[in-house]
Amino acid sequence: MSRLRLLLSDSHDPLFNLAVEECIFRQMDPNQRVLFLWRNANTVVIGRAQNPWKECNTRRMEEDGVTLARRSSGGGAVFHDLGNSCFTFMAGKPEYDKSVSTAIVLDALTRLGVEAFASGRNDLLVATPDGERKVSGSAYRETHDRGFHHGTLLLDADLGRLANYLNPDPKKLAAKGISSVRSRVANLCELLPGIDHPQVSEALQEAFFSHYGERVQPEHISPEQMPDLPGFAETFARQRSWEWNFGHAPAFSHQLDERFGWGGVELHFDVEKGVIGRAQIFSDSLDPAPLDALAARLPGTAYRADALYDLLRQWRSEFAAREAELEELSRWLLAALR
């Protein structure tokens, strides 16, 4: 058996690619050195300990069809599109060493004609007339006997969209969890016009082979060519689930307020594991009974619009005399939780 393994994904589905990565990592021979190359279409990828409602503009993401994906490693939130090239290096311990994989990526960039250097927060930077700019970010994961280093290279990413989706709505969130630190970034196409994913992929493969003094044939993976990985279907289902991508968020509090013609409303939610644990509703409405009833029903409900839709419809039906007012409040609340 070769000590190297090279896998290339033909899928742009981030949930598929992250599930493949997870299965390979769990099942790899610890004596092998693995390189997995992939790309994702429009996606915000958040770190394992992050709160998507705090990190992301979830409303704009839904409107624009942008996927949210939680990865198993730490670190901050990043936006992926097809202008990013993604890489994952895996190895067993004690050979796993992220400085080795970083050196391989730097060698690949040198082969392409870009002189980059490693910086403190897991980034690769280049010097430009405007100062140092980030062209690659990484995150890491280790278990008792293996580890991986994965990251992205910015080729021709839409940096404006990155800023749009990584800025949350002005919601009043008091959240626990890890916040992303924004960095000044640059695309490699600014330094190498015409650079594309196949060129970067080829350079990474050559640097990988050169470092280990061995070559292997790539294994191509796609949804049409499902990977022969035990447990993949279950891992893929988990990666796609709301419970993992949203429900795994750290505990946080959310405050919403709005003034309607019939009175002002202020809602306070405590949310844990994506479920409303406590709800308080304050109002100067002349008839607060419907709001008291709603506050009593909200605990135990998933913190998402589709889960609240049926609850709100049933609640309104019990206060038919105020149907128009409660419909107005329901529309506002559902829009706020998107």
From Swiss-Prot:
Domain called BPL/LPL catalytic: residue spans: 29-216
InterPro entries: aa-tRNA-synth_II/BPL/LPL, BPL_LPL_catalytic, Lipoate_ligase_A, Lipoate_protein_ligase_C, LipoylTrfase_LipoateP_Ligase
PANTHER family: LIPOATE-PROTEIN LIGASE, LIPOYLTRANSFERASE 1, MITOCHONDRIAL
UniProt GO molecular function: ATP binding; lipoate-protein ligase activity; lipoyltransferase activity
UniProt keyword terms in alphabetical order: ATP-binding, Cytoplasm, Ligase, Nucleotide-binding
GO cellular component, one term: cytosol
Entry protein name: Lipoate-protein ligase A
Family: Belongs to the LplA family.
Reactions accelerated catalytically: L-lysyl-[lipoyl-carrier protein] + (R)-lipoate + ATP = N(6)-[(R)-lipoyl]-L-lysyl-[lipoyl-carrier protein] + AMP + diphosphate + H(+)
Primary localization class, coarse: cytoplasm
Enzyme nomenclature, EC number: 6.3.1.20
Positions that bind (R)-lipoate: K134
Domain of life, per lineage: Bacteria
Known partners and oligomeric status: Monomer.
CDD domains in UniProt: LplA (cd16443)
Ligand binding (ATP): R71, G76, A77, V78, F79, K134
Subcellular location: Cytoplasm
Pathway: Protein modification; protein lipoylation via exogenous pathway; protein N(6)-(lipoyl)lysine from lipoate: step 1/2; Protein modification; protein lipoylation via exogenous pathway; protein N(6)-(lipoyl)lysine from lipoate: step 2/2
Miscellaneous note of the record: In the transfer reaction, the free carboxyl group of lipoic acid is attached via an amide linkage to the epsilon-amino group of a specific lysine residue of lipoyl domains of lipoate-dependent enzymes.
Protein task: Catalyzes both the ATP-dependent activation of exogenously supplied lipoate to lipoyl-AMP and the transfer of the activated lipoyl onto the lipoyl domains of lipoate-dependent enzymes.
PROSITE patterns given in the database record: BPL_LPL_CATALYTIC
